[in-house]
C-alpha cells in the first residue's frame, strides 16, 4: 500500500513537471518568436485539422519540432529519432511523453510505422521531419521514404510545411502551409521507385515553401542524388 501511494505521487510529480515543460516551452515559442502561418490552399485554413494527416517540414533548427508541435497542439504525435530519445539530456522527458514515436534512423525499422498508423487511426496527425536531421547550409537533405510509405498505406493526406528556420527575438518565424495531398499506388511502378519519386516530389515542394517563407523565390534545389553533403565545421561535430 505504501509503495502504491509513493508511486502515485511520483507519477503525479512527473505529470506536473511535463505539463509545466510543455506549456512553458509553447508559451516561450509563441510569445518570443510570434510565428506567422500562411495557408496557401483552400482545404486547410487553420491548425485545427478536420482529419488526421502526415505533417512534414524541413529541418533547419532544433526548434523546428517544438514549433510545429506548439502550433499543431492538439491530436498529434511526432516521430523522434531513437538515439535522441535515449540521449540522457532528453530521455527524462521524451520517454514520458505518450505522443512520441521512436524511430531508429540508422537501421531498418518498421515498428515506428505501425505505431504511427495506430495514431492516425485514433485521429491523431503524425509529424515527421523526413530529412532525419538538421541541415544548416540552406539546402535540404534527402527525404527518407518513411513518410510516403505511411501516407500511401493509410490514405492519410500529406500536409507540407515550409519553415524559414529563423528564431530570433524581433523576427516573426514564417511558416508556409500548402494544400494537403494524398499518395496513391501506381500500377506498373515498383513500390520502392514510386516512394522515392514521391519523396523527392515532396522534398521539392517543401523547398519551395521554405523559399516563400524566406521571401526568396527562384532558387533551385538539386535532386537528392546531386545535392552535396553538408560541410560541418569541426567544432560543431
Residues covered by each model-derived region:
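Glycine-rich, highly charged phosphate/nucleotide-binding loops
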Residues: 34-38, 107-113
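A structural micro-motif
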Residues: 35, 75-77, 98, 124, ...
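Non-catalytic C-terminal accessory region of glycerolipid acyltransferases
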Residues: 2-5, 9-12, 16, 111-237
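Catalytic core of membrane glycerolipid acyltransferases/transacylases, capturing the structured
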Residues: 47-107
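Short hydrophobic helices that act as membrane-entry/anchoring signals
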Residues: 3-33, 91, 95-96
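Helix-to-loop junction immediately C-terminal to a conserved catalytic motif
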Residues: 22-59
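Residue-level detector of flexible, active-site-proximal loop/helix-junction positions
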Residues: 42-44, 84-86, 107, 165-167, ...
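A generic structural signal for well-ordered alpha-helical segments
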Residues: 30, 72, 94-95, 119, ...
Amino acid at each position: 500500500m505504501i509503495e502504491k501511494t509513493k508511486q502515485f505521487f511520483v507519477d503525479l510529480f512527473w505529470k506536473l513537471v511535463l505539463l509545466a515543460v510543455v506549456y512553458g516551452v509553447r508559451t516561450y515559442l509563441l510569445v518570443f518568436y510570434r510565428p506567422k502561418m500562411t495557408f496557401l490552399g483552400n482545404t486547410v485554413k487553420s491548425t485545427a485539422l478536420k482529419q488526421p494527416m502526415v505533417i512534414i517540414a524541413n529541418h533547419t533548427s532544433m526548434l523546428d519540432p517544438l514549433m510545429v508541435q506548439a502550433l499543431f497542439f492538439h491530436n498529434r504525435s511526432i516521430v523522434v529519432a531513437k538515439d535522441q530519445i535515449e540521449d540522457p539530456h532528453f530521455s527524462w522527458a521524451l520517454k514520458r511523453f505518450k505522443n512520441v514515436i521512436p524511430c531508429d534512423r540508422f537501421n531498418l525499422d518498421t515498428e515506428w510505422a505501425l505505431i504511427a498508423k495506430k495514431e492516425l487511426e485514433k485521429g491523431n496527425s503524425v509529424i515527421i521531419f523526413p530529412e532525419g536531421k538538421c541541415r544548416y547550409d540552406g539546402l535540404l537533405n534527402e527525404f527518407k521514404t518513411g513518410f510516403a510509405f505511411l501516407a500511401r498505406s493509410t490514405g492519410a493526406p500529406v500536409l507540407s510545411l515550409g519553415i524559414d528556420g529563423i528564431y530570433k527575438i524581433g523576427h516573426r518565424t514564417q511558416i508556409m502551409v500548402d494544400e494537403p495531398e494524398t499518395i496513391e499506388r501506381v500500377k506498373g511502378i515498383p513500390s520502392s521507385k514510386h516512394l522515392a519519386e514521391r519523396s523527392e516530389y515532396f522534398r521539392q515542394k517543401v523547398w519551395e515553401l521554405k523559399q516563400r517563407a524566406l521571401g526568396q523565390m527562384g532558387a533551385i534545389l538539386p535532386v537528392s542524388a546531386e545535392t552535396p553533403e553538408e560541410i560541418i565545421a569541426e567544432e560543431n561535430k
